[in-house]
Amino acid sequence: MAVNKGYTGYNKELNAMAATHAYIRLSTLMSQIESWQATRASVLTHLGVMLNGVSKLGERSFFSRTKRFGAHTSDGDEIFCDLGGEAVTQILSRLTVALQSARGEGAQTRNAKRGAAPGTSQVENEEQGQTDQTLAISNAVAELMIFVRTKDFTMNECYTQDSFEAKYNLKWEGSSXRDGVSGKLRAQIVEEFQNRLIIADDLGIFPRRDVDGVIIRNEPEVVYSELEDKLLSFESSVYHPKAVTVEFEVPVATGTTTTDDEITTEDVEMVIVTEVLVDDESDYYWLYFVLLLTSFLITCFILLSRRFIHFLGNRGGPGAPLCRRFATRLWSIRLWLLRKATRRYGNLGVVRKTHSQTTMRKYLRDYNFQLEEWETAIGCTPREALIVADQHILVRAVQRIVDSVGDVDSVDAVRKVFNGYKVRNFKIEKWLNKQTVNSALAVLNDSTVPENVVLSEGMLSLQTATFEEVLRCNVESQRESAYFNELIALQFAFRLVGTPEFSDFVLAYKGPAYPCYVEAINRHGTCIIQHHVDEDQKRKNDRAIEWLLMAGQGAFVVSSVVTTGVVVFKIHKWLKQRLLLRALSMLPSVGGGGNGGGGGSLPPQALELFDRAGTFEERLAALQNGLDLSPENMEVFTPEELKTEIRHVVQAYADSSYHVADEPYLRGVGVTVVTGLPEAVGEITTTGSEVSSVDTSISLGVPGRARRRAVSKNTRMYPSTSGQSYNSYKSPRVSGKSGVGSMKMKIASKPMAS
């Protein structure tokens, strides 16, 4: 039987919306508004074109039960705009009124040639009115463009095909052999036909072939109905290893029925549609075999392992404790498998789906207007039965609201379910608020103030009731009151004070201005003002927190820089200390005469005492005690000259940040050097005094190889100066590092007076 295409879940509300709302592509709407903005609204001809475009904007009957939303486009992501929304309708109405009231440019001026010239005041009045009308039209077009670009419009009034069907719970099902099919659907049909041929050939029921696949030449006819029944039956397709049969029901409208009351109803028939699929990409023979073999082994172990386990447990002799433990473990495994098998066999054929509060909360959190009711499991607990009952209440209340037959009681039932499970669904809350406003307006806009109302004791009168009294009122006790329906509607509406939905309620309210309603409007305004104040305060607090975070980050950076500087300073100080001690330890000893040298370096004990000393005298005493100042080692250098050399080493490797005890070294070097060489002052020639004032590297005038050889032998090397006589003057002492580790050595001296 052929199946017609159609929407499932299509109702009266959607039918009315399709007839009254106009839809248009978002790109087309933007282009149209931009063209209106570029049009001169002061020309009468242009006004007519704009008015015609506004009145025919969009397409009505854009969808129906048999016409899919956006079906005329091949792109499913095309965006369509609903022009029937309340905000869009108001803006378009203002634009239409502005266009209809405009008269165009210069009616009196253009008609001046046909009769008497108009007066000056008449022309000025006409130009002023025309300017105001043009400004009103331009403002209306600009307002429409601004609203179209807002997030509210794009989120609530713009749809794709999938989002529209998901919002209104529509499902497009069915197929028709008479309708034209797209390329994608044609490919699916061909693929399904090929799958049917493959299955028929494998099962041996292919037309004009026997079981072995041999072609039958003289077969008179083929009974295609039997072939289709065999192909689509579960018994036949299940034997094919790659066949999958899917069956589902589709409601199809077979006709309409008109009653005596001229009420037309549609006759709906459920049609079963079956699809046969073939999986050509994977084979599961090995998986079936492994599972079957595993089941067989487990069954054999449960049935045949009892005697073997008893044999292991009762065995004596060597290894008996190990066998007993192994038997105990096998026995526990056997009992566990036996319990699992018993439980599986007892529940065979029973599919139980449990429902807990966790699953219900997840269902409510992700609720998207699903209307399928849960089934109660066999032998469920009372708690599960209550959860399923709450789900049924929710679904039925939502169904009544969607079908436009619900009231505030249905909205309250949905709210109670969400509040009972302490779940907040923002989308559902906004939808419920909107439905509350619609239900309340349907009651209040049609109500009138009754005259000569007589209320019994305890009944609340809306003529004198306050806002708080309406909210705290027990509506069940007011059932006999003349204001019962209005009281319920106002109570539900007053709960929305401070929300955007209450603003919509105020705009659409046409009922009596009760004192409680006026008080609710004032409270709503106060709540809105307080909301803006809170938003401003929140924004200021966020800005203050940002500044605090930035200040904290800046303090952290400064602290990191200071910490890094301190660490670098300590490392620098430690390096200076190590270099000073190494330079002192590597000083050449007093030679034993000639180039042979002799003696040893400063002992480690003297260097440790020097490092731990806190005053100048203690450090100098530590170095003096560590020197070998015996007469046999003083043949070339005097003790004063050796002390001077030590001072030069301290000067070269210590700075003002190293140690306070080294300041006397740095301040007294020049004086000590001069006083340490009194005999050489008068005997130095002019050339010699010039040379003695030089502070240069020892590598000047000395080859690198000779310098390294002299350093290795502890021999003093001096720069060669031709043509000068030293007489009895002893050359300046070499200070700094001795050549070990490529240390730099300097010649330090003070200029001498002639």
From Swiss-Prot:
Polar residues bias locations: 713-730
Keyword Electron transport appears in the UniProt entry: no
Cellular component annotations (GO), alphabetically ordered: viral capsid
One Pfam family cited in the UniProt record for this chain: TMV_coat
Subcellular location field: Virion
Transmembrane segments: none
Keywords linked to the UniProt accession: Capsid protein, Virion
UniProt GO molecular function: structural molecule activity
InterPro entries (alphabetical): TMV-like_coat (IPR001337), TMV-like_coat_sf (IPR036417)
Task performed by this protein: Minor capsid protein involved in virus transmission by the vector.
Full protein name: 84 kDa readthrough protein
Source organism per UniProt: Soil-borne wheat mosaic virus (strain United States/Nebraska/1981)
Gene: CP-CP2
